[in-house]
Amino acid sequence: SPDRTKVAVENQQPGTRSWMLDRTAIDPASRYRCPWVEGYASRTRVMAGESISFFVSTQPASHFQIDIYRMGYYQGHGGRHMGSWGPLQGKAQPTPNPGSKRLQDCHWAPCLKLIIPSDWLSGVYLAKLTEHHSSMQSYVIFIVKDQRQADFMFQCSDHTWQAYNRWPNQFSLYDNGQSQWYWGGGVEVGFNRPYGKYCQILDAPLSTGSGEFLLWEFPLAYWMESHGYDLTYVSNQDTHQYPEE
């Protein structure tokens, strides 16, 4: 059926390497965040026709731009540019006080609400944030899913990304405020916050904000899409909430 060739057809679209970050940095005081520009999305995954909002903080306040890319093979470039939004007015948004069980739950003002176009194929999408004053950059990551049957289901490990996310400073599922690595209960994490630096060994990793997708999962997606495998993408949240689908 025509659906079987969706990934192969998608990867015939012009590719680009502009999805890569050119300049980023980690605040030495926190060791985990890029306060010049950082953000998160209202949803971890979304379907075509549904809306997703982006929440961005720029410190100091300045304008910024959002460029969204679908990640795949694309003639070896790794991504396809889906659109640009901006310049948008940014502002410094507050770091929340720790909630119950050390939960970091940001309640930032949204900067952009986007309706996912009908022709955006299921996949992993990176929203590249570029702050105009310092040219600092970071990512917001989200998944576009669909309900079609495919030969392969690519499940992103976003629950794991979030479990190890220490944004803004030592607030992962394995931090209790006292031990370097904590293995007990009484700690919660959530998706209403940016992804901080985790296990990248560089001081300014060019994957800031993408969870652990670029580190561990993108190579498989790149390879599978290069061979035109029929696949669809989901989040850990999908298999947790809707295993029957």
Q: What is each stretch, according to the model?
A:
Residues T16, P35-H63, D67-Y74, G79-F142:
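Ligand-binding face of N-terminal immunoglobulin V-set domains in extracellular IgSF glycoproteins
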Residues S18-M20, A29-R33, Q89-Q93, P219-W223:
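Generic detector of short, locally flexible boundary/turn motifs and exposed helical patches
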Residues A61, D67-M71, Q75-G86, S134-E245:
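Aromatic-Pro/Gly-enriched surface loop or interdomain linker
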